[in-house]
């Protein structure tokens, strides 16, 4: 393991332990505390590359978590794992669930657009311009929303929207 990654893992584990201690003394009910601890364990496992363990912890967190913003964050992390594992359809469905819990997650929209844009490029390579346009239009739709939520945060996407002519001028800074 590279030295910098080892240091990052140490810091993440130290932060996780510290967060667990803080959560134990916070004046919130035990269900919320337990949901947060499962979430943190899922995040630590995800950072360590243990995706199956991370998904198990995230599932447990979702069973306990009532806060929609927190549920949206957990679902987003699950979708990232599915996307990393190449399960694009499950990733898209999970991103949509995450946005249903918290529609103000530009990274979900960005990642959905990445999947749509990839599919469009594949259709283009296969000579299917109509299918390519459908996928690119879907990418433009979600990316335009992401740029509106996070102006200046996705310059590469803003550039893609401009150069393909699929974005509205009002989305840019």
From Swiss-Prot:
Membrane-protein topology: Peripheral membrane protein
Disulfide bonds: none
Taxonomy, superkingdom: Bacteria
One annotated GO biological process: photosynthesis
Designated gene of the protein: ycf3
TPR repeats: 35-68, 72-105, 120-153
Keywords annotated in UniProt: Membrane, Photosynthesis, Repeat, Thylakoid, TPR repeat
Family: Belongs to the Ycf3 family.
InterPro entries in UniProt: PSI_Ycf3_assembly (IPR022818), TPR-like_helical_dom_sf (IPR011990), TPR_rpt (IPR019734), Ycf3/AcsC/BcsC/TPR_MFPF (IPR051685)
Organism per entry: Prochlorococcus marinus (strain NATL1A)
GO cellular-component term (any): plasma membrane-derived thylakoid membrane
Role this protein plays: Essential for the assembly of the photosystem I (PSI) complex. May act as a chaperone-like factor to guide the assembly of the PSI subunits.
Keyword Repeat listed: yes
Keyword 4Fe-4S in record: no
Compartmental location: Cellular thylakoid membrane
Listed NCBIfam families: PRK02603.1 (NF002725)
Protein name: Photosystem I assembly protein Ycf3
